[in-house]
Amino acid sequence: MTLKAGLEIHQQLNSGKLFCNCGLSENGKDVQFKRKLHATSSELGDVDIAAKTEQIKLFTYYNKSCNCLVYTDEEPPRGPNADAVKIALQFAQLVNAKIVEEIHFMRKVVVDGSNTSGFQRTGLIATGGIIEYDGKILELDQLCLEEDSCRHGEEDHEYLLDRLGVPLLEITTKPQLDDSKDVQKAAKAIGRLLRACNVKRGLGTIRQDVNVSVNNGQRVELKGFQDLASMPKVVENEVKRQSRLYQMKEGKIGQPINVDNCFKKKREFSLALKIENWNGILGNKDSPEGHVRMGRELADYAKRAGLKGIMHSDELPAYGIDNEETENIKLSLGCNDNDAFILIFGKEKITKNAMEIIVERINTKGVPKEVRKVTPKNLTRYLRPMPGASRMYPETDIAPFKIANLKVRKPKTLDEREKDLPLNDEESKQLVNNELDKQFNILNKKFDLPKLLSRILLHTLPQLKNEGETISDSDLEKVLILFQKGVIVKEGIPKALVQSSRNEEIQVNSDNVEDELEDFIVSLVSDKREFIKEKGMGAVGALMGPVMSKFRGKMDGGDINKVLMEKVKEIL
């Protein structure tokens, strides 16, 4: 089977929210309100299939931590945020994409509770462009600026508004990847290029989706990758799953029938469906990856309709249904030994809706066009139907945004920033990866101490932070000034930083510290004369310990070692 894959990257931008004046970390008052969302039709009057599926559940959505009226959908949106637009344009420049003259925002229907308005706003920024990875080129399809969704709360119906409205840059590539490892490499290259711009960092700030198809079949969108390391394995397993779906027998189905009279005890409304020649397919566990187990697949479809799951002939009798009841169902459906059946229970309306969805899925040949979520075992499970063009319609509350009014400078890439640093490759890479190169350049321009500054930023400050100390930029500059004046030595910088941060007096070197050092070493080597004669110059290492314990931070370690070696030689 031939793989064809493309990427969709969603990166949070480090600006204010997209259509209000709220900051990204602002939570506001703890306000609770409820909404029941309904799917709206597109310009052509069609309702998107994905929106229809969400609407079947008839949830009442609950949001809290409300931070402004725009994102409670109580007042019109403002904006868009100019800083967010600039960041998006910077990335467009980096990939040589063709930037649009005006941004026209659209509404994308979303009724799963993740947006209070029932839609997500998105605007096209640029088209085309390329990403280079591992000596290869991947073409981009388009770049869009959109608003992020709510976070899930503790309950399924509960959502938190702190993330709603955070600007997202959506990067969509063309389906040109034909190797699972290339999918990972391309995603990594895009992520690295994004970090040249002012984007958010940390867990959950970037999300990667992968579109996968085999043999030019239907596109399946994979969501929820935990990390880039799992990407090749997930894609490989998805290719196997789709390949097996193409090889699977076609299931011929009968009419769903009510089988309430097949049970000894009264149960909820029940429907059963016969599937010819599917015996063993619903509960198949033969493949090592667990694909394709159609019973689980159909159960996931039923859950989206509001049921808790399904039962099927490959696992019955079980779950309170005995052998006699199982045989009654088979008899009612007219099943033979090669046939299978599906059984569902629930409220009549929900059960009928669920059965319609199950029937539609069974009748779909090969691979259905759908969205699937990635599991911790690097497999995928059905999430929802693939949205279509019917979910889009124009945003009437936001005027077109003219890009010509913005002056945007193309940022340097991470590689370019590394080359600009007067350090070795490893130190330069660490500073850039930790977003410390800007601070380094500012300090180095003032003090011209590249090696020392690299050591302080990469090692000293993180170590002090781990010890619970908070060192400000002013503390660091104050100590560096004292170092350049020669009143503290390199080894004394960590202690001086702590003293400055605690508003304590910084202990500087005394004028006679060299005399004190010489007196101390003379006394020490006199006491250890026999030890020195026995060990020779090898005694220096052992004697450095007590000397450094007294003079660490007062004098340079190299100078201390030099004096000690001279005194040891005199003994020898």
Residue ranges and their predicted role:
Residues 103-105, 114-183, 377-385, 402, ...:
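Conserved, charge-rich beta-strand/loop surface module that forms ligand/interface-binding patches
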Residues 94-101, 149, 196, 244:
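Alpha-helix capping at helix-to-loop junctions
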Residues 25-26, 143-147, 223-229:
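A short, sequence-level motif marking secondary-structure junctions
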Residues 106-113, 205-213:
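A short beta-strand-loop-alpha-helix capping motif that often carries His-Thr
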Residues 1-103, 109-110, 188, 203, ...:
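N-terminal, positively charged regions that mediate nucleic acid binding
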Residues 3, 17-21, 136-141, 219-222:
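Short, well-ordered strand-loop elements centered on a beta-strand within folded domains, enriched
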Residues 4-7, 13, 30, 76, ...:
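Charged, compositionally biased, marginally structured helical/coil segments
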